[in-house]
UniProtKB/Swiss-Prot annotation:
Function, as annotated: S-adenosyl-L-methionine-dependent guanine N(1)-methyltransferase that catalyzes the formation of N(1)-methylguanine at position 9 (m1G9) in tRNAs. Probably not able to catalyze formation of N(1)-methyladenine at position 9 (m1A9) in tRNAs.
MF (Gene Ontology): tRNA (guanosine(9)-N1)-methyltransferase activity
Protein's recorded name: tRNA methyltransferase 10 homolog B
EC number: 2.1.1.221
Range of residues in the leader sequence: none
Protein's organism: Mus musculus (Mouse)
Basic and acidic residues compositional bias, start-end: 1-10, 84-96
Amino acid sequence: MDCKSEESAQRTDSQAFQEPDGLPEAGGEDGLSESFQLLQVDVEYERPEETSPANSAVWSSKNMQRKQRHWERIVSSKKSKRKQERERRKAKRAEDPGNGTCPQHSKRFLKALTKEKLLEAKHSGPRLCVDLSMTQHMSKKELSRLAGQIRRLYGSNKKASRPFWICLTGFSTASPLYEECLRMNDGFSAYLLDVTEEDCFSLFPLETLVYLTPDSEHSLEDIDQSTVYVIGGLVDESIQKKVTFQKAREYSVKTARLPIQEYMIKRQNEKNYHSEILAINQVFDILSTYFETRNWPEALKKGVSPGKGYVLQNSAEG
């Protein structure tokens, strides 16, 4: 029994010191070092995510540098574009020094300045009345065109250095035209002008009215601030003649026409078309320009487009 136990113990000890399969025999320190290196490679292959802190820090640092350079390029590009835009605006102001705006003025300041000018015109400026009492027979298309003309008229008056006070008469807030103005004109309900259902003949003393109509026998010579100038708010594609003239005659109101015949001549065109009928915003542009410059040729050039078949006398040869 003692001999068998001793042999069993020897076999156990022999197995305990047996080399692992696949590894080279332990041949001193070199063989042992080589074995540990192979084991280390296996461990790193099985867990590649375990990188050294030093390598991770280097990679993170390079990534941050790339992001920083990318961000700096974006910032530099934006600065360059802003500089170019400032230079473009500066050059534009140099080309047109009389545009009436200052770069240091904010939109809020300019809005307040415009409001102040318009309110001052209400008390001391010339008055312009747009007679909208003839819109009941106008089509939807004609109403839309008239709403657009009202918007352009108001826009021109806001930009004028000496604005008129505008009054829209015979204008019901329940009318299709009012709805069209709200639809087409942003902020229409906040326009600085008067809106009333009364017609101009009952709102103002008749002796203060001058109805502007192309059918009048009298030419408008000057603008008087004590006079209320009336424009017929009428867009009529069928071109009914003398509608506004007859209405003025009905109330025994003075009439006048723009001095187109005095300062302009007919120019030959393919359609042989010549007309003194203008949109209300074109009539206003002429009145506003004349009120600022006191120069009829300049004012007429502003409002009478070449399509009307008229040119200024001194430019007829062109």
